[in-house]
Design a protein with these regions (language model features):
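Asp-based, Mg2+/Mn2+-dependent phosphohydrolase catalytic module
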Residues: 10-14, 18, 35, 39, ...
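Metal-dependent phosphoesterase signature
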Residues: 1-32
Length: 158
């Protein structure tokens, strides 16, 4: 839907008067390498999450055992704006005190993560894992600075 409308999932659902299904957090689980990767990255970097997620994102990260590695959590339901809207990225940058050129957006979605981050001048890493493996880069504006196959591959670049 992004490539046609350039609107976030929440905005499209609202316009279509679609009630999004309740998020079943008990089915959430981390990729095998997630906790170790976050732990290692948090030693040298401040880590923030920008997510199109319902209320309670921070608590769910706590339940998964990784919140302690994350400095900032920006969830669309709490901010009233969702990716790919650049405002959610600007909120994260402002709260972190980070300039776009000093930030790296790591994401699995070209439309919601890579494109808006590049437009703001952030560096980008596309993880082609899970949902990310379903995407194909179609335009130069969608090309990430770095492409990796899984989260732990990021450690080779940062």
């Amino acid at each position: 839907m992004y490539r046609r409308n350039k609107k976030g999932d929440l905005e499209i659902a609202k316009q279509l008067r679609i009630e999004l299904p309740k998020w079943e957090s008990q089915y959430e689980k981390l990729y095998t390498d997630s906790e170790d990767c976050l732990k290692r990255l948090s030693r040298n970097y401040e880590i923030g999450i920008i997510a199109n997620q319902p209320l309670g994102t921070s608590e769910r990260l706590e339940n998964l055992g990784v919140r302690k590695y994350i400095d900032l959590v920006i969830a669309s339901a709490e901010e009233g704006v969702s990716k790919p809207d650049r405002r959610i990225f600007e909120i994260a940058l402002e709260r972190s005190g980070c300039k776009p050129e000093n930030a790296v957006m790591i994401g699995d979605r070209i439309d919601n993560d890579i494109v808006p981050a590049k437009q703001l001048g952030m560096k980008t890493i596309w993880i082609k894992q899970g949902f990310g493996s379903l995407w194909t880069v179609m335009e130069e504006s969608e090309k990430a600075d770095i492409e990796v196959n899984n989260l732990s591959d990021i450690l080779n670049y940062l």
